[in-house]
Design a protein with these regions (language model features):
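Class I S-adenosyl-L-methionine-dependent methyltransferase catalytic core
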Residues: 2-79, 83, 87, 108-117, ...
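Phosphate-coordination loops involved in phosphoryl transfer and adenosine-cofactor binding
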Residues: 96-99, 226
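A gly/proline- and charged-residue-enriched helix-loop-helix capping module
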Residues: 124-148
């Protein structure tokens, strides 16, 4: 048995996609946990498994992780700030000049200012009483997510000033029936993801997938250390780099020799950046046709496939309905032929993470491939973990102000 049950609050960057990533990652790592609350902007998890904090380091779809060994409260009248801060901050209270701040997330916008004022004033007095009499408060700013309002401190500032032991950010979740308070101990490493995007030798921000999204997709595959991940449209290797970063075995294929050269160059750079020693036989990256995967691999031999075929032209402006339809129709056969080939080489119960485009047209319509109609025909089904049975595919990433969105599917072979 483990020492104690801890409560973890994760602030999400992609709502549905982030929650799905967390569930699949924890299930894949055989972590025992319970979801006690979730919303568009956060998820609250209880666990006594010490491995869970390492699992959180693998995620791409979060901003912050906080934890608490304290109980939630029904309302602010139940708040005992001295006891709460003593339990959360411990030895940090020995620092008279403690730098701290509050980030408050709520389903009810009208409660934000009242909660902020009440907790800020009570915590200031409690910190003085507990010995941090020269503490400094970092102010939060208003933000709005879909369905969630917040007074928050940006994760970059938390990373720079408010992580233990020198600082303390306290996360307050005002949920439907309870108020949860926890201390942030980890933020997403924005700089590292940015470096992986812009410092590598070859990148194209106009069409390449952001490394954070690639990390999420790798996690959605549910891959384990003994398995192999294939990207049959690998391009310059964005997805492959994230899989390598998590120490997974990878295979990359692209029909363009120039893209394979770029992918190999990026991987060599990444091995030096991350100080990873790659054997001469790994990774396996070669020129090949994604529509003929059975020419390179045995049937039922690949564990996981994660890919984003980029077959549409770069859209400089919104197309007409007619032009959008033509573009989709022109590339549809390649998508479906490749998907059919993927199914042949994929192991039973193996998973395909497929990204397909959705185009916004001049008159505001959104047009995409009829992928759903082919899934069952090819012997696939939408993958829904036990704790996410109500999820709806595709999961859309991006906003409608963009000319093209990403539709994400998590599919499993029967």
């Amino acid at each position: 048995m483990f020492d104690r049950i801890l409560k973890y609050i994760l602030i999400l960057s992609n709502d549905t996609l982030s929650i799905l990533e967390i569930i699949i990652r924890l299930d894949c790592d055989l972590i025992k946990y319970e979801i006690i609350d979730k919303s568009d902007g956060w998820i609250i998890i209880e666990s006594e498994d010490p491995k869970i904090e390492n699992a959180f380091t693998k995620l791409g779809g979060i901003f912050k992780v906080s934890k608490s060994n304290t109980k939630s409260i029904k309302d602010l009248d139940e708040l005992n700030p001295e006891i709460l801060l003593s339990e959360l901050l411990g030895n940090q209270l020995n620092n008279r000049k403690l730098i701290w701040g509050l980030s408050i997330y709520s389903n009810k916008e009208h409660d934000l200012n009242e909660i902020n004022k009440t907790i800020t004033e009570s915590f200031k007095k409690a910190l003085v009483a507990l010995g941090a009499d020269r503490n400094k408060l970092i102010r939060s700013t208003f933000a709005r997510f879909e369905g969630v309002s917040a007074l928050e401190i940006p994760s970059r500032e938390v990373t720079n000033r408010l992580l233990p032991p020198s600082g303390a950010e306290l996360i307050v979740i005002n949920s439907k029936n309870r108020i949860h308070i926890a201390q942030t101990f980890r933020c997403i490493d924005h700089l590292d993801f940015r470096n992986k995007d812009f410092l590598r030798p070859h990148q194209n921000s106009e069409v390449s997938m952001p490394p954070r999204l690639a990390r999420i997709l790798v996690n959605l595959s549910g891959i384990t250390k003994s398995e192999v991940l294939l990207d049959p449209f690998c391009g310059a290797g964005t997805i492959l780099l994230e899989a390598i970063d998590l120490r997974y075995n990878i295979i990359g294929i692209d029909i363009e020799p120039e893209q394979i050269s770029k992918a190999n160059s990026n991987i060599r750079w990444f091995s030096k950046y991350r100080k990873i020693t790659l054997s001469k036989s790994e990774p396996k990256i070669f020129v090949g046709d994604s529509r003929k995967l059975e020419s390179y691999f045995k049937e039922d031999s690949i564990d996981r496939i994660v890919t984003e075929p980029i077959l549409l032209p770069l859209l400089k402006k919104l197309p007409s309905n007619e032009n959008a339809s033509k573009m989709l129709k022109k590339s549809a056969s390649t998508y479906f032929d490749a998907l059919r080939s993927m199914v042949k080489v994929l192991k039973p119960k193996g998973r395909i993470i497929m990204v397909a485009p959705e185009i916004k047209t001049l008159d505001g319509q959104l047009m995409r491939f009829p992928l759903e109609s082919r899934i069952t025909q090819l012997g696939l089904k939408e993958y829904k973990p036990n704790l996410a049975q109500n999820i709806q595919y595709p999961i859309i990433v991006g906003t409608e102000i963009k000319r093209a969105l990403r539709n994400i599917y998590v599919l499993e072979k029967n």
